[in-house]
Amino acid sequence: MELIQDTSRPPLEYVKGVPLIKYFAEALGPLQSFRARPDDLLISTYPKSGTTWVSQILDMIYQGGDLEKCRRAPIFMRVPFLEFKVPGIPSGMETLKDTPAPRLLKTHLPLALLPQTLLDQKVKVVYVARNAKDVAVSYYHFYHMAKVHPEPGTWDSFLEKFMAGEVSYGSWYQHVQEWWELSHTHPVLYLFYEDMKENPKREIWKILEFVGRSLPEETVDLMVQHTSFKEMKKNPMANYTTIPQELMDHSISPFMRKGMTGDWKTTFTVAQNEHFDVDYAEKMAGCSLSFRSEL
């Protein structure tokens, strides 16, 4: 893994005004050759919003609830991450070559950077949105452990960057709103992390209906159990512990940290919360989306 030595903490690179992890920005060129298929299914989220959770659910659905098949490889090999590229590890595009149809794909890209082929092919999308406060806290911890990001700095300075859209993948506010708008004209199932926490079974039924598949209720119950945070946290095929420590240091903060709603309250000060709420109201004005930041 000597390739990884120089990967630590490069500055973000801007592409079409969107800040990205340096290596991911470099992957966007090769990604132009990607061709979507009508039977592809895209999992789209802003980072730290339940991507791996919904990926595991969808892989289980595609494998007919067979747990053994879901253990065949780590989640990032089972669900290729389109823009993923880090020295020493197969890129998303490389993983894609070995992925049989029907394919599950993952992205965090905002619409400005999304390969047009996905929209042209009317590929179905499962989008998961999570409340901004929990995303910001989770992202801060993720920046610490995933060394492809720049240094996060203090929590206060990171929160300011998050609010300004100066973190990897840019503005949360724009991301959740533009994919919401797309859901009115494109086959997008728009889910909320908080709804999944509250009643995972109900949300899994929604996903099944959306992808046009049916499974017996006992299989769905098994899926609820197997894709619970507790189970996924200890599952090496889901928890990213198979990634080299030089890239993701779980001793700093585990990839699967708390998986709860409302954890932001342990991190935000009263002043930060008030400041955030004022800014949030401005940025989300006129948007019909409403989020729950506690359950």
From Swiss-Prot:
Gene3D superfamilies, per database record: P-loop containing nucleotide triphosphate hydrolases (3.40.50.300)
Modification sites for Phosphoserine: S138
Annotated EC: 2.8.2.1
Class in the EC hierarchy, top level: transferase
Pfam family, one: Sulfotransfer_1
Function: Sulfotransferase that utilizes 3'-phospho-5'-adenylyl sulfate (PAPS) as sulfonate donor to catalyze the sulfate conjugation of a wide variety of acceptor molecules bearing a hydroxyl or an amine group. Sulfonation increases the water solubility of most compounds, and therefore their renal excretion, but it can also result in bioactivation to form active metabolites. Displays broad substrate specificity for small phenolic compounds. Plays an important role in the sulfonation of endogenous molecules such as steroid hormones.
SUPFAM superfamilies reported in the protein's UniProt record: P-loop containing nucleoside triphosphate hydrolases
GO BP field: dopamine catabolic process; estrogen metabolic process; thyroid hormone metabolic process; xenobiotic metabolic process
Cell compartment(s), UniProt: Cytoplasm
Assembly information from the UniProt record: Homodimer.
Record InterPro entries: P-loop_NTPase, Sulfotransferase_dom
The protein's name in its UniProt record: Sulfotransferase 1A1
Residues bound to substrate: K106, T107, H108
Active site: H108
Keywords (A to Z) from UniProt: Catecholamine metabolism, Cytoplasm, Lipid metabolism, Phosphoprotein, Steroid metabolism, Transferase
Catalytic activity: a phenol + 3'-phosphoadenylyl sulfate = an aryl sulfate + adenosine 3',5'-bisphosphate + H(+); 17beta-estradiol + 3'-phosphoadenylyl sulfate = 17beta-estradiol 3-sulfate + adenosine 3',5'-bisphosphate + H(+); 4-ethylphenol + 3'-phosphoadenylyl sulfate = 4-ethylphenyl sulfate + adenosine 3',5'-bisphosphate + H(+); 4-nitrophenol + 3'-phosphoadenylyl sulfate = 4-nitrophenyl sulfate + adenosine 3',5'-bisphosphate
Listed transmembrane segments: none
A cellular component annotation (GO) from this entry: cytosol
Binding residue positions for 3'-phosphoadenylyl sulfate: 48-53, 130, 138, 193, 227-232, 255-259
Family stated for the protein in its record: Belongs to the sulfotransferase 1 family.
Gene Ontology MF terms: 3'-phosphoadenosine 5'-phosphosulfate binding; aryl sulfotransferase activity; steroid sulfotransferase activity; sulfotransferase activity
